[in-house]
């Protein structure tokens, strides 16, 4: 069975907590990503998604100079490089996330996206299940 380290993206664009939302959004546009890890001295501190920007910045009347630390999601779900793709898929489905940061001794070493799992033959069923669970989130 393939492990996360064989599939994860290791060249991950990141931002620091003290960068501005405008800088983060520009970096997200440049790399064509909907989420970016927030890292300080190699340690994963949070994730910033396009949804975070829309709901916690724009919708609240804040401007682009708002620090990432005030907008990022800090309740993190992460995986480790040695976990199986099956386990990563299940974790993503359970927490309804499309991107799973991969950490080793608290340091960000990569990221696995739902699309990465979908292209791996061994986890196609799990990726489909994860996508189904993410797409059918419970309304609260």
From Swiss-Prot:
Signal peptide: none annotated. Residues 8-64, 72-127 form the CBS domain. It holds the Pfam family CBS. This is CBS domain-containing protein YhcV. Keywords: CBS domain, Repeat. CDD domains: CBS_pair_HRP1_like (cd04622).
């Amino acid at each position: 069975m393939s492990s996360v380290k064989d599939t994860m993206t290791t060249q991950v664009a990141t931002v620091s907590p003290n960068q501005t939302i405008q800088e983060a959004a520009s970096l997200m546009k440049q790399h064509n990503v909907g989420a970016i890890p927030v890292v300080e001295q190699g340690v994963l501190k949070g994730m910033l998604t396009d949804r975070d920007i829309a709901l916690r910045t724009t919708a609240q009347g804040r401007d682009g100079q708002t620090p990432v630390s005030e907008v990022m999601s800090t309740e993190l779900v992460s995986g480790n490089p040695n976990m199986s793709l099956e386990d990563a898929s299940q974790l993503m489905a359970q927490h309804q996330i499309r991107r799973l940061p991969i950490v080793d001794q608290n340091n960000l070493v990569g990221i696995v996206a739902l699309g990465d799992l979908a292209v791996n033959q061994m986890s196609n069923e799990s990726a489909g299940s994860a996508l189904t669970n993410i797409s059918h989130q419970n309304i609260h």
